[in-house]
Amino acid sequence: YRVYTRQGRVFSVEDEHGTIAEDMPVVREGRTRAWVSIMYGCNNFCAYCIVPYVRGRERSRDMDKIVAEVRQLVAEGYKEITLLGQNVNSYGKDLDIPQDFADLLAELDKIDGDYLLRFMSSQPKDASFKLFDTMARSRHVAHQLHLPVQSGCDRVLRAMNRPYDKARYLELI
């Protein structure tokens, strides 16, 4: 149980497993780059990784909350906004009404302004041609991918418990 204060307001935070605390104040420095978490946790269980055990399973934020946060950042003059998640490509699969990462990017692209959207990390197992098409058509999404290329060896990828192989990477790029 923790209490945070900001500008005279008090926020109480209780750790409730599997929930996302929305509307918490975010302290950002400068007005150039901002980072926006779109999801928390991970479902991949790579052999060497502790994230699913300490952060839990994937939990996506509501699209409306993300769009509102990015709209506010653009209004405040931020020029580069990076969307964050252990595996952004699986965004929205856990929501009551499942959504798609490409759909989120398309919604964010509708926000007027002079800004660039980036995202990381983009796991190849959930990358789709719909995502690439959305990126290609977008006015604001950077035409680059942050792919965690940790090995080009199928044997090593299997040992890492990665559900894809070198051929899948080559298909994507």
Residue ranges of predicted features:
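Conserved SAM/AdoMet-binding glycine-rich loop
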Residues: 75-173
